[in-house]
Structure formats: structure tokens, C-alpha cells
Amino acid sequence: AGAAREARDLGAAEVLTHQVDVADAGAVQRVADETVHRFGGLDVWINNAMVSVFAPAWEITADEFRRVTEVNYLGTVHGTLAALRHMRARGRGAIVQVGSALAYRGIPLQSAYCASKHAIQGFHDSLRAELLHDCPGVRLSMVQLPAINTPQFSWVRTRLPRHPQPVPPIYAPEVAARAVLWAADRGPRELNVGGPTLKTRLADKLVPGLLDRYLARTDVGFAAQQTDTPIDRSTWRDNLDVPVDAERDHGALGVFGDTSRDRSPALWLATHKPAVSAAVLLVGAVLGWSAWHGAPRGHR
């Protein structure tokens, strides 16, 4: 309801919304079909549904692993295939997968979530090559996010003693939204959002074993994923199997607004590469000119 209201406030003449379990492939396909029937086609499709379980792997049940996989990974597959059914017929469109730095590097206490994001990354790689071969007009992008301040952490399933949080630094949802919009418009293979995403990927590439021990022995891997507030088990509800207060508009903001960042210099650099390249060339030219004209000249 909130998203529909905001779309209308921004000038949308008609808005269509659905509540659907993305683990149900048929239901997702019906949403895509109805959207095409109503509006005449699909231009952009964004896969963003996610659930998680905060706990050591041995405390997560087989059913919980299965549910996280069904929503995060298979939900992405279902959404992508539903969109492709229409986009391939038209020969154009844009699909954006909302990923995570954890698609490349798993962390403690989120094994189910990390595994599902790794699976999405593999699916993305395979499908993108297939589309470039058979239907290059359909663009496929993946946006790798850092920690984002959404309500998810107030209703995630957890067996931790204190309120869960994403590993800081935490960014505002608007940072993620700008990245997804840019990816939908430009169609890059991948877009890394935030310095932490780049650092995580680099560390895992260069020193994965050292990173294992760092996460195991420092607060980053364990204490940093919890606040100081104890969980009241008598009132805590999670959304692993069903939505929490589905009739209420929870908005996009979580409880970490006081500490979240509303800008990402790394994202700005990634989305302004021509300007950055031009600036580097200009600085290089100025320095070269200064060095040339400042160098001592021999007498004739």
C-alpha cells in the first residue's frame, strides 16, 4: 500500500500491486502475466525478496535451510523466468537481481542466507551468458549491497540473545534504491555498492584463509551482528514462513536510522566512471604540463 501511494504521488496514472510468495513459481508467473495484460509489457523486473536465519549452522533446521533457499534463491529464479517469458518475446527488457557482498563471502551466523546469495550469483553468471548469446536485448544485472537499514532485522528468525543487525557500516535504503535504479537503466553486469562490499570481495579474493580467522576471532563475525538490546522471546515474531503484520505498512526504514549512512562515495565513483576518468586525465595532464614547464632548461 505504501509503495502504491508513493507511486501515485509521483504521478503514476495506474498502479498494480500484489502480495505473493515468491517460492510459488506459478503465483509469480501469474503476477507477471497480469502485469503484461494490464500494461502491455514488462520493461524492468527487480528480484529483491529475502528471508534469513541468524544462528550457527548446526542450530538451523533442514526446513529452515530449505525455506531460505526457496525464497531467496528459487524466488529469484522464479521471478527471472517469469519476466523472461515476456521479455524474450519482445526482445528487450532489464532484470536486476538484488545481491549482497555475502554472495562472494559467507560470514558466521548467516550460513543459510549466504549460501542462497552464492547460488543467485552462479545463476546470474550462467544466465547472463545465455542471454548475450540468444537475446542480447534483455539485460541482466546484479547489485551487490552492503548492510542496509531495512525492517528485516526486526522480524528475522534468530536464535541470538540480542537484537540482530547487519554488520556495520549500515547504509540507508535510498543508497540501495539509487543503485538498483541505475542498474536497471544502464544494465551493467554487476554493481558493487559501498566500500565494505569492495573490501569484502577483495579480502576474500586475496586472503580467504586469513579472513576466516579474522571473522572467527574478532567481534566483526559475531558481536557486530547484534545490538546491545536483549530479545524478548515472548513478543518476537519472524517472517520466515509468513509475513509479520501483512496489513500494516512498515515502510523501508529499519531501526538503525541514527547510525546509517545516506551516501556512498564508492557508488558515486562506480556510476560516474566517465567523469572520474576525465578528471584523472585532466589532473594527469596538468601535472605533466607543470613538470615539463617547471623542469630546468640547459643554456645554449
What is each PLM-predicted segment?
Residues 100:
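Residue(s) in the substrate-gating loop at a strand-loop-helix junction
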Residues 56-57, 64-66, 279:
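Substrate-binding pocket helix/loop in short-chain dehydrogenase/reductase
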